[in-house]
Amino acid sequence: MHITFGWGFDGARWVDPATTTSGSLGTVTTGPHQLTDILATRLALSAPECDAPMRIAAYRSVLGRVLETSDQHAWPVASFRADPWTVARELLSWRDRLVSAGWDGTVPTADMPHRLRVLSTVEKRLDGEPGWSPGPADVLRQVDLTLAHLVDSGDSWPLGIDRIDLDGQLADLSPVWTRILGSLRSLGVELHELPAPAPLDALTLITSDTVWDAAPVAAGHLADLRDASTRHTVIAGTSTSLLDRERVRIGHPPLGVASRQASSYAQVIPLYLRAMTAPHDIHALVGLLNTSITVDEKTTPLVPGPLRSRLIGALNEQPGVGGPAWDAAVSDALAASADHPGTAQKITDFDTLIRHRPLSDDNGFDTADVAFHLEWLQRQFTSQGRGQSVSSDVGSRIAPLRELISLLGERISSRELDQVIAEFTGTGGISVQAGADDLADVVTDPAHLGTGSAQVVWWLPVDDAAAPRDTVRPDELEWLTANGVDLPDPEADARLTLDSQLRALRRRRNVTALTVDTINGESASQHPALTFLIDDLHRQGREPVTLSGDLPEEHRSLPVPVSIDVPDPVSRSLTPGEHLLPTRISFSQWEKLLVHPLEWLLERRLGIRAGGLATIPSGNQMIGTWLHTVVENIVNRHLDADADTDGAVTIPADHDEIAAELRRLLPWYAAELQMPGHSRELGATLALAEQSIAGLFTTLADAGIRIRAVEASFTTTLAGSHGAEGDLELGGLRDMDVIMADGTPGVIDLKYTFARKKYRDAVQDGTALQLAVYAASVADEHSLRHLADVPVAYFNLRDNRLDTTDERFGAPETLSVDPSETGASDTDELWNRAVTGLNHILDGLRAGRVTDLGNLVIQEDWQAWEKPKKGTSPASPYDEDTTTRYTDDLREARTTGFFPEKNAVYTDYPLITGAQGDFS
């Protein structure tokens, strides 16, 4: 075998594929790692490929036991206690560097420096530790010792190596490699030092401002080389994604150099564990439900489909784990999977793990529980994946991950668990997936050019190497040297790497480097090898050719201007017909039709809705649902046990009962508040909620008001409305039906909001349409003549405040109606005007037109024109005829109909309607 050995040749080409020169059998080009493997094979010293995370785990276990008996103030006890995984990884890396330099884990002695004594103590106990295996450093040390033994003993051994050509000087190598190559020469291997190549014949620098500017220039230059049938090699030490886009655009294959990233599936592991940990992270659970596995272009949800779809609905109703909606979702999913026992078992197992056996981070996770939970995830990946798919690969990695976690003791901190998972799934560096090319080759490091001769195109020669770090203290270095361990100098290693790169570049004779001033907004540092190449020319009195990175005219192309049709957010024309009209509406639909009919049309007639995972309640919506349910459950219990003959009940303000119900429903309806970092918010919310709910019951009891029902469903006819089949049916749920002290039926609408004046203003301004809807339904049920005869009120569960115009509620302040521009003097007038406004919208839909006045009044240009600031005269954003029409429509909506203008700012689909978006 003929070996060409260079310090940076690991990964270099054995032959130069960009030339016509063919390689020969038994000729290889190697660096230190590859030569170590060859020698280990020839000397029968090969070891199975080691698993780095398992080695770290084994080292961590032994180090932990050693430090348990150490002085608690000694190095590195405190660091290990705070971050055991990182400390173990760093010490193992240091241990491997020592071993590769010849250290044999000498028995600790009194004169040994403390840090080395710790390493020696650990080294003695590694043999037999589960998960421990020798690493590359151990193999290198054994190769060094074995070759030295063969030299000393005079024994013959068939190495099968005839000659080694060293790209550099033997004296410059690290001590261990000087010994190894010297031993090989003593054993009969010819050793030759290759001569240093001469400086370059030509160096061209093409400079650009940014990578975006350099990409089309580089693509054009490479295209010119191909057109001229010139063989070349591209060096790309960073991603070529932008360059590849330009190459594909002009019809050339991509170079395929990309940053290595962990599989998106690997990111599911920490996501899954967060979702499985109580208190449950609902956002993590939503992410898990949104995760799919793609194999052979077929996408399957990670969580079984029948359960996934139902859990999405359950979480929209109750954003927590284990409540009634969750129970119903699991039961329905199992029923739907009755003919698929495998799917049913996965559903049962998932429900059991997350609801009945959740993980708990109580001073760390129980490692056995973590491994048990990961088994379900492993089965999902392996059952969905096939062959060499990414899915099956992730599944196969989970098995050793479970084994490793089990080796880390009984408990593991959440931080260390994340580190372990990252160690298994993380990647680094860059990878090349270039297509076959008879003229071009791609490498990621200048040294990988090896001994080839084709000219070079260097894409972004920037210095991104870390500065060499020496972790050995002077007293430790002195002790190691005295005991025969010659540590390599980090700076000397860096010089060897640079020299290897320079030799490979100089052999190519012709180099074109595409440089940029900034990368990712920061100044780009020039690669040191390029600096030396320029200095080579300077010493010869020459200069590199410097060109501006302007794209050649023949490679320039400008995009054709595209005309964008800006959607009209206010007025649209449609195919007229009854198909656009509803037959039944709720209050929310009614209000939407009045303020944003275009959005109602998108949602109710075109079926456009936000995805279920995007609408999981949070914030005030989540808390409001939780408190509503607390009130509902307490009322229903008392109705079942204590109702009067007329089916109503007076509920005492029992703080213990309220607090207990709040706590019981918390994980089902507001799991988000149980997460770390929310304790202050949770405490404040619990206190406010308890006080407000107790205040509600106290206020009603003091006024002699009894509760008749909560969440009472109703259906009534919207008399005089122009629906698809005549009068519309109006339906919904009333929050709380009450019987006043004088026997009159009334309604309370429960709210939870930080806007203290929102509903108070609605009552005073005569715009409380929701209360009017409730009043109409009660009046219909009890044959009351006027809506104003029905006492109605808002109760804010956050502020413990009742907003009403009816003094019979006993509120501290009874409000009076002072109609605003769009309000009504009483409930009956508001109802009639709202019906008039609704009919105007419905008649427009029937005729095939829709005018969204809500989108009109939220436009800044319209606001500036309609209500100009003092001293200004802005123009209308519309032509004169359109402005007149919109002004008339607004006047009619505000005075004759009902236009809930304050709610216009709340939009669901502004980008679709054109109310928002940059169309410039």
Please state what every model-predicted region is.
Residues P567-S920:
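RecB-family 4Fe-4S metal-dependent nuclease core
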Residues M1-A641, I651, H655, R663, ...:
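Polyanion-engaging groove/track-forming segments
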